[in-house]
A protein has these predicted regions:
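Short glycine/serine/threonine-rich phosphate/pyrophosphate-binding segments
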Residues: 45
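Alpha-helical metal-binding/catalytic segments enriched in His/Glu/Asp
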Residues: 42
Length: 134
């Protein structure tokens, strides 16, 4: 990976293409957005693979993140809550959803990199196509 710093932004020259990074969200992705995106990219892909191995066919997974940051400590992230909403024709029991969430936490390299410094929760909720989220 190669990064070039110019003016108010950094441009990463990565395998997929260039990635503009800046604290100014009109000229690049904010570092916070990229940090959270890396966690979602890793955990979301892993969740999809786990569901496939468990033969839980799903139409879509939506992931919502909320965070708590500490302005007194360089605005660091102190807490992240990730909720994955799985849309499927079949529902998961609460026990299976908890087991799957635990597998994601234990096997996601990005989550494991920060789990000791950030209070992180990961929830899996399912909804069948004709029902509400469970």
């Amino acid at each position: 990976m190669k990064f070039t710093i110019e003016n108010e932004k950094i441009v990463g020259d990565l395998g997929f293409g260039s990635l503009p990074i800046s604290p100014n969200d009109t000229i690049g992705y904010r570092p916070y957005e990229l940090f959270v995106s890396s966690l979602i990219g890793c955990s979301g892909t892993l969740l999809g693979n786990i569901l496939k191995k468990k033969r839980v066919e799903h139409k879509k997974i939506e992931m919502i993140v909320s965070s708590v940051r500490n302005p007194d400590r360089a605005n660091r992230i102190e807490q992240l809550s990730i909720t994955a909403y799985v849309q499927s024709d079949q529902s998961l029991s609460e026990q299976n959803a908890l087991k799957i969430a635990d597998l994601v936490i234990k096997n996601c390299g990005m989550i494991q990199s920060v789990i000791e410094t950030i209070d992180l929760t990961f929830l899996v909720k399912t909804s069948t196509l004709n029902s509400d989220v469970r």
